[in-house]
């Protein structure tokens, strides 16, 4: 069974994104769930990959800002 350490939800247009930092016997991970009109899709990022995930996301945001 997963233990939720922290959970945050954001709404963007007609979608909700749920960010759950979880832990189970295999380790800690981030689950990002997209809820769009009742349909849910999720990705899971193991804790060791969170810094790299953030680095790439920061680069994407910077490119978006530069593109205007």
Range-by-range predicted roles:
Residues 1-68:
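Positively charged, low-complexity terminal tracts
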């Amino acid at each position: 069974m997963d233990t939720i350490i922290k959970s945050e939800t954001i709404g963007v247009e007609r979608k909700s994104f749920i960010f759950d930092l979880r832990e189970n016997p295999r380790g800690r991970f981030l689950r990002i769930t997209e809820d769009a009109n009742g349909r849910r899709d999720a990705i899971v990022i193991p804790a060791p990959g969170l810094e790299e995930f953030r680095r790439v996301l920061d680069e994407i945001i910077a490119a978006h800002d530069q593109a205007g």
